[in-house]
Swiss-Prot record:
Biased composition (Polar residues): 322-336, 343-352
Stretches for region G4: 557-560
Organism: Lactococcus lactis subsp. cremoris (strain SK11)
Ranges of residues in domain tr-type G: 448-619
Region G5, annotated ranges: 595-597
InterPro entries in the record: EF-G-like_DII (IPR053905), IF2_II (IPR044145), IF2_N (IPR006847), P-loop_NTPase (IPR027417), Small_GTP-bd (IPR005225), T_Tr_GTP-bd_dom (IPR000795), TF_IF2_bacterial-like (IPR000178), TIF_IF2 (IPR015760)
Gene name of the encoded protein: infB
The name this protein goes by in its record: Translation initiation factor IF-2
Pfam families: EF-G_D2, GTP_EFTU, IF-2, IF2_N
């Protein structure tokens, strides 16, 4: 058997189309239905040769049978058959040539009989229509017997014929008999042998239908044509000549007699009353299967007609299409004016439903960073979509609620021709601006205020004693060690005028407190002891006052002492830029010699203060919200955070919402310097208040806000910023400080937790401890706060291995018990220099001890003894010093140290001894060393601890 090939494979090899190959194969009689079928090599050659040479199609056996019966076929019929091939289900349908010849003859007879058929048509139209009588089944069969016998053979082989073939067969049967004769005019009522079909002219039918149709109603012409065509395809027996357009009964074997009449009545609305042209035809009996096939075929034809007419460009418009157009017009015409209703949108209108007024663009726009598209659109009265489109064209995709940056806002405003002006946002949390802002105070409401005087000077020069004389109280007696620990604010009245005094510590640890005191003061009283003269803190006070631009009044104190020398003090002050008024009238300072202990010249000093204050013309506005500075702050167990404030501008009232430093609250209580509760405090008034959420820092500013909500927001924002700054100041390891950091890993540190009574003392103590310089040890302040020592402080100290230092505070009972359990060291002090001295001593003791090598003896090896399982024993003689058991030894050979180790054993003769003296012999073993030779030298030494120099 030869190899087979598929048609598509042959097409690829030869370059021919699959369709040509399949058609040629079928014409050659091969059983090939598609290009996927296989053929032999011989068949393939025949197919290819047939395609190339154009071989005629071989007739199939069914066609041969028909052609055998055909003797002569006219050329016209043959050409007609070739021009219009009839197909059914994609297959060729073979027709009898005799039938085609008869069809041609009948068509010629039809043309000749048209003139004779017109009088008959008029007679029929004048007669009264008669009801069609049921036609018996045998009559049409007898009438068309001859034609059936001819068509039977074709039907037997083709089995199924298209509706067009049926129509042609019926027409042949109709046209076989004479169409018009005089005898048939007389015998119209008689039963004819063949039914005559009288057809009206199509032009007349169209005119009558157009005249009977209403003007506003438009029907589909193609649908009427389809109905007529379908009626012609369903011939019926009607005795009165009425067709389907007027309700003619369609003959069906499986349908009741009255059903066709009802269907004709339903179709009556598509035809006019004058259209009475009908056709009484017959059809051969068909089975139920054929009827179903006919109905399916009619539906297919109807759908095909719809597709050809309505869905093709240029086809007639249907009623449904009209309705869709109206609906689309209603949806698209959204801006036409009209009321609600089904037909309102059909009314045309040129006025839009919503007309947006034209708004002119502003010349400039003050914008804020973070505005969105919707905000900008409202400001310039434009649609957000328009702005979004502009931004999209600029390469920025945003929505109307998205925040825009500064550059984008300016870009879109400039695109519209609007000048962008950035709105300067007022930082409400920045309370420092209120102290320098010009518009905050009302010039017309300014009144004279008391002067704020700060007393400064070196430690133990009499500052607190002087202030005590002013207040006529015994403040100094309450100070531990006679040293002022923290700042105090007091107000006195002399000659009808008030003066506010601030007392600052004189110890070197309180530098920051003196600087804060100078920043809020109007006048500085520099106290200098006449017997001591100018000291380091005196110079520091001078520098602080000059930096703040504050006038200085020099009070030379202790002039009552025997060694007092005011002239020497004046000379020393001039060396630091402080000159008496007699020496420098313009920039000179007032010098007053006083004795605070004996109340000497104090009134003169107060008069000098009032004189200098009057020259300065100190004023304030009591009508605004209060602002000022924190003098001191502390934590009380019962009252909470307590802050000493100095009001500088405005008036402070009870229940005022206030922001103090990085904390906030509401003024709960206010007390003056005498401990009395007050309801308001004016400018230059020192007060002590409660109600804050946390303890502020000394030197922080405070300001009163309009409501508590704003105060809370400002306080939280300031706390957040302070935390951020603290994090930024935290030292980070980088390549620059990596080596230093690694070196610090060898440095020991002492962890300290500081708890003090006031914030200023805690700050000063922390600064002083961090200044302690001991090589190899540093101070690490783990925590610093105000208030009593609590359980949380003990837990923190235990976790960080820290020492707790309490300054003027005591631990609670529970904290003391917990400290005993955790073995936490608590040191309580009330004098700052004692704290510093104690911590410095502890830091020096934390250092590792220093050792120095001390040579105690020297010996020479005289003999060596090797003992199994023991090692080498060296016999030696001490030539200098001594050899001890607890010492170390170096083995030196020819001036080179070959081993350095400990002595494992030491003997004098056979006895174990602790030492061998000078000029004595003995034996020893060097630990982990057996390579000892004669004449080696033993250098015996010890590491002696030496005391660290302070």
């Amino acid at each position: 058997m030869s190899d087979k090939k598929r048609i598509n494979q042959i097409a690829k090899e030869t370059g021919l189309s699959n369709t040509e190959l399949v058609a040629t194969a079928q014409s050659l009689g091969f059983e090939v239905k598609s290009h996927s079928r296989s053929v032999t090599a011989e068949q393939a050659e025949k197919i290819i040769q047939g395609v190339k040479t154009g071989t005629d199609t071989i007739v199939k056996p069914a066609e041969k049978t028909v052609k055998a019966k055909t003797k002569t076929v006219p050329e016209t019929a043959k050409s007609k058959q070739e021009d219009h091939p009839r197909t059914f289900a994609g297959k060729a349908v073979v027709e009898d040539p005799a039938i085609l010849a008869r069809i041609k003859e009948k068509e010629e007879a039809k043309k000749a009989a048209k003139t004779e058929a017109e009088p008959i048509e008029e007679v029929i139209t004048t007669e009264k229509p008669k009801v069609a009588e049921p036609v018996k089944k045998s009559e049409p069969k007898a009438a068309a017997k001859a034609e059936e016998t001819k068509v039977e053979k074709v039907e037997a082989k083709a089995k199924t014929v298209t509706p067009k073939a049926e129509v042609k067969t019926e027409n042949v049967a109709d046209k076989k008999e004479p169409v018009v004769t005089e005898e048939k005019k007389k015998s119209l009522t008689q039963k004819p042998r063949i039914q005559i079909k009288v057809i009206k002219r199509a032009e007349d039918i169209k005119k009558e239908q157009a005249a009977a149709r209403p003007e506003k109603k438009k029907f589909d012409k193609n649908r009427n044509d389809r109905n007529n065509r379908n009626d012609n395809r369903r011939p019926n027996q009607n005795g009165n000549g009425q067709g389907h357009s007027q309700g003619g009964n369609h003959y069906d074997k499986n349908r009741p007699a009255g059903q066709g009449q009802n269907q004709g009545q339903k179709r009556d609305k598509f035809a006019s009353s004058g259209s009475s042209s009908t056709s009484d035809t017959f059809t051969p009996a068909a089975s139920g299967k054929n009827n179903r096939r006919d109905r399916d075929r009619k539906k297919t034809d109807s759908n095909r007609d719809n597709t050809k007419d309505g869905n093709r460009k240029g086809g007639p418009l249907r009623v449904n299409d009209n309705r869709n157009q109206v609906r689309n017009a209603r949806n698209s015409n959204w801006n036409q004016k009209g009321g609600r209703g089904r037909y309102q949108n059909n009314q045309s209108s040129n006025v839009p439903a919503t007309q947006r007024k034209f708004h002119e663009l502003p010349e400039s726009l003050e914008y804020e960073v973070g505005m969105n598209v919707q905000d900008i659109a409202k400001s310039i009265k434009r649609e957000p979509a328009e702005i979004i489109k502009k931004l999209f064209m600029m390469g920025t995709m945003v929505n109307q609620n998205q925040s825009l940056d500064e550059d984008t806002i300016e870009l879109i405003l400039m695109d519209y021709g609007v000048t962008p002006l950035k709105k300067v946002e007022e930082d409400k949390s920045d309370i420092e601006r209120l102290f320098v802002e010009d518009g905050y105070l009302n010039e017309d409401k300014m009144v004279e205020r008391p002067a704020v005087v700060t007393i400064m000077g070196h430690v133990d020069h009499g500052k607190t004693t002087l202030l005590d004389r002013f207040r006529e109280s015994r403040v100094t007696e309450g100070e531990a060690g006679g040293i002022t620990q923290h700042i105090g604010a007091y107000q006195i009245k002399t000659n009808g005028k008030k003066i506010t005094f601030l007392d600052t510590p004189g110890h070197e640890a309180f530098t920051s407190m003196r600087a804060r005191g100078a920043s809020v003061t109007d006048i500085t009283i520099l106290v200098v002891a006449a017997d001591d003269g100018v000291m380091p803190q005196t110079i520091e006070a001078i520098n602080h006052s000059k930096a703040a631009g504050v006038p200085i009044i020099v009070a030379i104190n202790k002039i009552d002492k025997p060694g007092a020398n005011p002239q020497r003090v004046t000379q020393e002050l001039t060396e630091h830029g402080v000159f008496p008024v007699a020496w420098d009238p313009e920039n000179g300072s007032e010098f007053v010699e006083i004795s605070a202990k004996f109340n000497q010249n104090l009134e003169e000093l107060l008069d000098t203060v009032l004189l200098v204050a009057e020259v300065q013309e100190l004023k304030a506005d009591p009508s605004v919200r209060a602002i000022g500075t924190v003098v001191e702050a502390r934590l009380d167990q019962g009252k909470g955070a307590i802050a000493t404030l100095l009001v500088q501008q405005g008036t402070l009232h009870i229940q005022d919402p206030i922001v103090v430093g990085n904390t906030y609250g509401r003024v709960r209580t206010m007390t003056n310097d005498l401990g009395r509760r007050i309801k308001e405090a004016g400018p230059s008034t020192p007060i002590e208040l409660t109600g804050l959420s946390d303890v502020p820092q000394a030197g922080d500013h405070f300001a009163v806000f309009e409501d508590e909500k704003a105060a809370r927001a400002a306080g939280e924002e300031r706390a957040k910023r302070a935390q951020l700054i603290k994090r930024q100041n935290t030292r980070r390891v980088n390549l620059d400080n990596l080596f230093d950091t690694l070196k610090e890993g060898q440095t020991k540190s002492v962890n300290i937790i500081i708890k003090a009574d006031v914030q200023g003392s805690a700050e000063a103590l922390a600064a002083s401890l961090q200044k302690i310089e001991v090589e190899g040890v540093k101070v690490d302040i783990v925590h610093s706060a105000v208030g009593a020592i609590s359980e949380s402080d003990i837990s923190l100290a235990a976790a960080s291995n820290a020492i707790i230092i309490g300054f003027n505070v005591r631990p609670t009972g529970l904290a003391r018990e917990q400290a005993a359990q955790e073995e936490v060291d608590i040191r309580l002090h009330s004098i700052i220099y004692k704290v510093i001295e104690e911590v410095e001593t502890a830091m020096r003791g934390m250092l590792d001890p220093e050792f120095k090598e001390e040579i105690i003896g020297e010996a020479i090896v005289r003999e060596t003894f090797n003992v199994s399982k023991v090692g080498t024993i060296a016999g030696f003689m001490v030539i200098r010093g001594k050899v001890t058991r607890d010492a170390s030894v170096r083995v030196i050979r020819e001036g080179v140290v070959i081993h350095d180790g400990a002595i494992a054993s030491l003997k004098h003769f056979k006895d174990d001894v602790k030492e061998v003296g000078n000029a004595q012999e003995g034996g020893l073993m060097v630990e982990d060393f057996n390579d000892v030779e004669i004449d080696d030298t033993f250098e015996v030494y010890k590491m002696v601890e030496i005391e660290r120099k302070k």
